Amino acid sequence: MDTKTLIASEIAKVVPELEQDAIFNLLETPKNSDMGDLAFPAFSLAKVLRKAPQMIASELAEQIDESQFEKVVAVGPYINFFLDKTKISSQVLEQVITAGSDYAQQDEGQGRNVAIDMSSPNIAKPFSIGHLRSTVIGDSLAHIFAKMGYKPVKINHLGDWGKQFGMLIVAYKKWGDEAAVQAHPIDELLKLYVRINAEAETDPTVDEEAREWFRKLEDGDKEATELWQWFRDESLLEFNRLYDQLHVTFDSYNGEAFYNDKMDEVLDLLEAKNLLVESKGAQVVNLEKYGIEHPALIKKSDGATLYITRDLAAALYRKRTYDFAKSVYVVGNEQAAHFKQLKAVLKEMGYDWSDDMTHVAFGLVTKGGAKLSTRKGNVILLEPTVAEAINRAASQIEAKNPNLADKEAVAHSVGVGAIKFYDLKTDRMNGYDFDLEAMVSFEGETGPYVQYAHARIQSILRKADFTPSATTTYSLADAESWEIIKLIQDFPRIIKRTSDNFEPSIMAKFAINLAQSFNKYYAHTRILDDNSERDNRLALCYATATVLKEALRLLGVDAPNEM
C-alpha cells in the first residue's frame, strides 16, 4: 500500500462522513518538508461537522492511529503526517530490488488491446520533425499502456491516398527524371511537390490536371497505379530507415488506401440507419444534438468520399479486428473538430464503443517561431537532424570520457534520446520551438541530463562492486535519501497518471525530478565511505538506477551504463 492510500485509509476510519477516495484526492504535499510529508485540510469537513477547521484538525489528529507514522500533528486547519522513514525506505527498496524492471507493473489492462494510430506520415513527402511528435508520443504511450497491463497495437495509418498523388504524377510527368528519383527518391519527390504547388498558385489548369490523374488512380489506371506504388515503396524504405534509428516499430502499416474498398459498407450502414441527409447535393450527417454545429460531410456532390468516411471505415475495421479496450489517435490539435465529428457519427450509428476512442492531440513544432510547412519547403528534416544530434552528443562524450568503449552506440542513444525526450517533456497540448543545441545539452531538464545521472549511478555501483541481496533489509532515514524514496514510491502512481491522461510529459518530468534528487544526494553524501550506512546508500543507488532506466524506457529512450 502506498503512503497516500495508507493515510487516506487511516483518516477514513475516523471520518465516516468522507469516502476514502475523496480523502485521497484532498491530500496535499506541504511546501516545507518541516511541516510533514502529507497533509489533510479539514476545511472540507467544516460544513458537515459544523465546527471550525482548526478544531476538527486538532480532534482528528488525536483519534488517528499513530503507530503507522513517525508522528501525526495538527497545525491550524491541517493534519500533518510525518512518515516513518526507516520503515518505508525499507519497504520501497525491497520492492524495487525484488522486482527489478518489473517494479510498478500493473494489471489494469488485463491483456486487452489498445489501438494506437500514430506517426502516419504522407507518402512521397519527407519525414519531418512535425511527424516526430505523433511518433514519439504514440511510442511512449504504447510502452505506458503495456506497463498498465494492456497490449498495444501500433498502427501507422500512412497518408498514401489523395489529390496530392494527382499533383505528384503531374509534376513527375512534366519534370521527373527517373534516375534522379531512384538515386534520391524523397529529395526529388519533395522538389517536384514544392515546384508543382508553386505553379498551381498561378496556373489553375494544374489543379484540373491533378484531379484528372487522381480520378485515373481511383479507377485503377495502369500508369497511375504503377507510379503511385513506386512513390509508396520508395517512401516506405526511407521511413523504415528512420524508424530503425528511432527504435520505433509498428504492428500495422494499413494506410488510407487500405480502406478504399471498405467505404461502401459505411455508406450502406449510414443509409440503412437513415442518417444521411442531402445538403446542396452533398450527403451529410447532422450532429447538432452532440453540440456540433457543422454536419459531418460524408460524400461530396460529385460523389467523392472524404477523410471522415475513410476514418469511419478504419474505426469499424479496428474494432472488429482488435476488439480494442481503447483506441487512441495521436494527431495534431488542428484535427480536433474532425475527431469530435468522427466519434459523434459512430455514436449516431449506435456504436457505444466510440466512447473508448480518444483524440490525443498535440501542439505544433516551430522553428524560430515560424510554422513548418512541407508545401512551402519550410521543413526540418528528421534524418539530417538525427545525424547532427548524434554528432553533438559524440563531441560532448569525447570531451567528458575520451576512453569510453562503444562511443558510437552511446552517442546514438544520447542523440536520439535527446530529441525524443525534449519533445516528450513538453505538455503535449503545448508546442515547442525546435532547438537542437538545447536538446542535446547535458545540463538542464534534458534527456542527456537524466541519462548521465543513470550512468553516474552505474559507475558508483561498478566501483563498489555492489549487487543488492533480496534477503538483506536496507533502510535509510536522512532527508536527502528520503526525497528519493518518496519519488520511487510514487512511480506506480506516475505511470497510472501518465496512462489516464495520455500525457508522457508526466513521466518525463518525473525522470527529471528523480535525476535532480539523486544529483543533490550525490553532492551531499559520501556514498562510498566505508561505514554502517554504505550498503544502504548503495541499495538506494541501485533502486534509483532501476527506476530511472525504466522511466526512460517508458519514454522510448535508452539508458547507457556509461557515458
Curated annotation (Swiss-Prot):
Q: What class of enzyme is it?
A: ligase
Native source organism of the sequence:
Streptococcus pyogenes serotype M2 (strain MGAS10270)
Span-the-membrane segments of this chain are none
Keyword terms: Aminoacyl-tRNA synthetase, ATP-binding, Cytoplasm, Ligase, Nucleotide-binding, Protein biosynthesis
Q: Which reaction does it catalyse?
A: tRNA(Arg) + L-arginine + ATP = L-arginyl-tRNA(Arg) + AMP + diphosphate
At the top level, the lineage of the source is Bacteria
What are its GO biological-process terms?
arginyl-tRNA aminoacylation
Gene Ontology molecular functions: arginine-tRNA ligase activity; ATP binding
| Any Gene Ontology CC annotation | cytoplasm
Give the signal peptide range: none
Q: Which family does it belong to?
A: Belongs to the class-I aminoacyl-tRNA synthetase family.
User: Would the keyword Cell membrane be found if you checked this record's keyword annotation?
Assistant: no
> Where does it reside?
Cytoplasm
The gene is argS
Q: InterPro entries from the entry?
A: Arg-tRNA-ligase, Arg-tRNA-synth_N, Arg-tRNA-synth_N_sf, ArgRS_core, DALR_anticod-bd, Rossmann-like_a/b/a_fold, tRNAsynth_Ia_anticodon-bd
Enzyme Commission number: 6.1.1.19
One Pfam match, given by its short name, reads: tRNA-synt_1d
Q: What is this protein called?
A: Arginine--tRNA ligase
